[in-house]
Amino acid sequence: MSVDTQKVIEDNKRSAQDTGSPEVQVALLTARIELLTGHFKTHKKDHHSRRGLLQMVNRRRSLLDYLKKKDGERYKSLIEKLGLRR
């Protein structure tokens, strides 16, 4: 059980060579966060991994704030695409 990095990049890239845009970074973090969330359903006392999860959530929040400040339309489309902010 791991994140299919290439598929996530393909689905969210802005150009042919894009691997580091905020959209791609947020999508990769979201995929890893969802994977870890499932892990915690069975391993409730895994506090070391929970710390890593919180760091990923904070990093994603920072990237989303940056994207919202720079380009609101890209932010809105990414939120819809990933299903965040219900």
Swiss-Prot record:
Subunit structure: Part of the 30S ribosomal subunit. Forms a bridge to the 50S subunit in the 70S ribosome, contacting the 23S rRNA.
Role noted for this protein: One of the primary rRNA binding proteins, it binds directly to 16S rRNA where it helps nucleate assembly of the platform of the 30S subunit by binding and bridging several RNA helices of the 16S rRNA. Forms an intersubunit bridge (bridge B4) with the 23S rRNA of the 50S subunit in the ribosome.
Species in which this protein is naturally found: Xanthomonas campestris pv. campestris (strain ATCC 33913 / DSM 3586 / NCPPB 528 / LMG 568 / P 25)
Keywords annotated in UniProt: Ribonucleoprotein, Ribosomal protein, RNA-binding, rRNA-binding
A Pfam family hit: Ribosomal_S15
Keyword Cell membrane: no
Biological process terms in GO annotation: translation
InterPro entries xrefs: Ribosomal_uS15 (IPR000589), Ribosomal_uS15_bac-type (IPR005290), uS15_NS1_RNA-bd_sf (IPR009068)
Compositional bias segments (type: Basic and acidic residues): 7-16
One annotated Gene Ontology cellular component of this protein: cytosolic small ribosomal subunit
Region (Disordered): 1-22
Gene name in the database record: rpsO
UniProt keyword annotation of RNA-binding present: yes
Gene3D superfamilies assigned to the protein according to its UniProt record, in alphabetical order: 6.10.250.3130, S15/NS1, RNA-binding
Name of protein: Small ribosomal subunit protein uS15
Record-linked PROSITE patterns: RIBOSOMAL_S15
A single MF term (Gene Ontology): structural constituent of ribosome
SMART domains to which the protein is assigned, alphabetical: Ribosomal_S15
UniProt family annotation: Belongs to the universal ribosomal protein uS15 family.
